[in-house]
């Protein structure tokens, strides 16, 4: 079995890349230090990276990898950079002004303009059609991008790069064109994550490993019309996420369940925990149905076992073997005391999840505590919250804030310190205003903190995405809370995932057309088999919304 070498500087989720390469029939050998790096014994090298530019390139240099990487490139053997692995080829980035890259490409990365679109870019974009695409990049396929900083192009920069021998695959986010992939001689790199881009991404990895550039398939005019990017949503497809609430039932089995206003027990039948299936099998099923992401919310956090034996780690490891789209895990991402009394910081907990196959971690209760502290300190963090420590190491895009709010009616802004708005749906006593109160501990405890205040604080502390639940809508199958979504979109510039209330495909369309939701999440309607993820996507496609279709 041919061997692929992967440089490991402990930057994010290498498990998924390893799984993708093994899925393609290759063996993976991780290169953890320069002394493990034998150029003559290496035929394919991959440099993956996630998170903060400076954190990654400084790590690369401090561990002594610069010289062997340069010698390997000089040898003419194939190398592939992924995400920050692509960015490391550049001179530097405004994200980390004091850090220097490998400087194979002489210009600096810059941040996307967030005045016109959410930043980070999180979602499925495409390469702009060109005659010079390479390694099977297909302008009618979608690839998974997750980044705030990019090699943003203008005509002069593009011309200079091409004059220097670089082939460029461009993508466009909002009005900004940037480098999606580059190729020169033996160097190939992608800004997107091919290991998280479904079958389309696996094809790109396979083409690199086989050093082949097959032609773009012959699509019919009708197929091109359906699949081509119309840039109606900044260039991204409408993202559909399948969510699995995981907990142990009364028999000790790990099951996927679903609440009704956060109550996961049956109304009859002895009040047992609703069992809607096994998490790994369901995740695989939703991936096959076309889910753009799968989220595991570990709703009991498995408090009675050592962290390293947490069942969720095994769930992630198994799911990541066959689910080649992003995986998010939530529950228990905080500073903990292990069963043996050892104190384990949130960053270490998150790192364990990332190494097991997670791409993002979701923080709930501790995000509320962090936001309260942020305001107590006069609108600043102190660097110790899980949001700050994890985003500093892995990047904002790795930190999702899971919010569990409920609607509170008031007569005017004077009734609360939290931001209110005038609602179309007056309260039981004719109240015209409302705010959304944050809860903790799975909705069991309310705090004097509004969703507006929470999300703004978390964005400032370094979070990259909001998973916006709604206790009032949970399990209702009556559609998302559209007012809540718009309220939070007014508050922050990071992407917002609409959650709670979806019962039919029309609810997804309604959220995408009537709000600025960046993604929509479904749970019960998928678990019960009433609709598949593909049913939702087909419906959206029929109604003129672009979605990712990942068929061979």
Curated annotation (Swiss-Prot):
One GO cellular component term: cytoplasm
SUPFAM superfamilies xref list: Class I glutamine amidotransferase-like (SSF52317), Ribulose-phoshate binding barrel (SSF51366)
Pfam families found in the cross-reference section: GATase, His_biosynth
Metabolic or biological pathway: Amino-acid biosynthesis; L-histidine biosynthesis; L-histidine from 5-phospho-alpha-D-ribose 1-diphosphate: step 5/9
Record protein name field: Imidazole glycerol phosphate synthase hisHF
Residues annotated as the enzyme's active site: 83 (for gatase activity), 193 (for gatase activity), 195 (for gatase activity), 245, 404
GO biological process, one term: L-histidine biosynthetic process
Species of the source: Saccharomyces cerevisiae (strain ATCC 204508 / S288c) (Baker's yeast)
Outcome after substituting residue 258 to A: No activity. Uncoupling of glutaminase activity from the cyclase activity
Gene that produces this protein: HIS7
Binding partners and assembly: Monomer.
């Amino acid at each position: 079995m041919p061997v692929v070498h992967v440089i490991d500087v402990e930057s994010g989720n290498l498990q998924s890349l390893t799984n993708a390469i093994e899925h393609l029939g290759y063996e993976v050998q991780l290169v953890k230090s320069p002394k493990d790096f034998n150029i003559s014994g290496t035929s394919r090298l991959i440099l993956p990276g996630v998170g903060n530019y400076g954190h990654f390139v400084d790590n690369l240099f401090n561990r002594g990898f610069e010289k062997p990487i340069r010698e390997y490139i000089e040898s003419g053997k194939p190398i592939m950079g992924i995400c920050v692995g692509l960015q490391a080829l550049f001179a530097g980035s405004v994200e980390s002004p004091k850090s220097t890259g490998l400087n194979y490409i002489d210009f600096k990365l810059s941040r996307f303009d967030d005045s016109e679109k959410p930043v980070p870019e999180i979602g499925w974009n495409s390469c702009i059609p060109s005659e010079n695409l390479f390694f099977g990049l297909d302008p009618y396929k979608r690839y998974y991008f997750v980044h705030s900083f990019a090699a943003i192009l203008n005509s002069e920069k593009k011309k200079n790069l091409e004059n220097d021998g670089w082939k460029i695959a461009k993508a466009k986010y909002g009005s900004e064109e940037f480098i999606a992939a580059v190729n020169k001689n033996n160097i190939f790199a992608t800004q997107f994550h091919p290991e998280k881009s479904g079958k389309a991404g696996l094809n790109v990895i396979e083409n690199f490993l086989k050093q082949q550039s097959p032609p773009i398939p012959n699509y019919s005019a009708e197929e091109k019309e359906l699949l081509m990017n119309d840039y109606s949503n900044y260039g991204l497809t409408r993202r559909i996420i399948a969510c699995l609430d995981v907990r142990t039932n009364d028999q000790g089995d790990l099951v996927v369940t679903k609440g009704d206003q956060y109550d996961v027990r049956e109304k009859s039948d002895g009040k047992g925990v609703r069992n809607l299936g096994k998490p790994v099998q369901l995740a695989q099923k939703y991936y096959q149905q076309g889910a753009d992401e799968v989220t595991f919310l570990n709703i009991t956090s498995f408090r009675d076992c050592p962290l390293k034996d947490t069942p969720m780690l095994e769930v992630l490891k198994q799911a990541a073997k066959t689910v080649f789209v992003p995986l998010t895990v939530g529950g228990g991402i905080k500073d903990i005391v292990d069963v043996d009394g050892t104190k384990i910081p949130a960053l270490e907990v998150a790192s364990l999840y990332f190494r097991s196959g997670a791409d993002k971690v979701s923080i709930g209760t501790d995000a509320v505590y962090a936001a309260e502290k942020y305001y107590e300190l006069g609108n600043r963090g102190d660097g110790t919250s899980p949001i700050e420590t994890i985003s500093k190491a892995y990047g904002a895009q790795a930190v999702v804030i899971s919010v569990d709010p409920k609607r509170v009616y008031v007569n005017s802004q004077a009734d609360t310190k939290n931001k209110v708005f005038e609602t179309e749906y007056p309260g039981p006593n004719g109240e015209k205003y409302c705010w959304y109160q944050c809860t903790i501990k799975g909705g069991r405890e309310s705090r004097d903190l509004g969703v507006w205040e929470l999300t703004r604080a978390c964005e400032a502390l370094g979070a990259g995405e909001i998973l916006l639940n709604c206790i009032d809508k949970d399990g209702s199958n009556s559609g998302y809370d559209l007012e809540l979504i718009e309220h939070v979109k007014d508050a922050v510039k990071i992407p917002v995932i609409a959650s709670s209330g979806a019962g039919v495909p029309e609810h997804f369309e309604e959220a995408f057309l009537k709000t600025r939701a960046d993604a929509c999440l479904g749970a019960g309607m998928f678990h019960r088999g009433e609709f598949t993820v593909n049913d939702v996507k087909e419906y959206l496609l029929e109604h003129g919304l672009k979605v990712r279709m990942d068929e061979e």
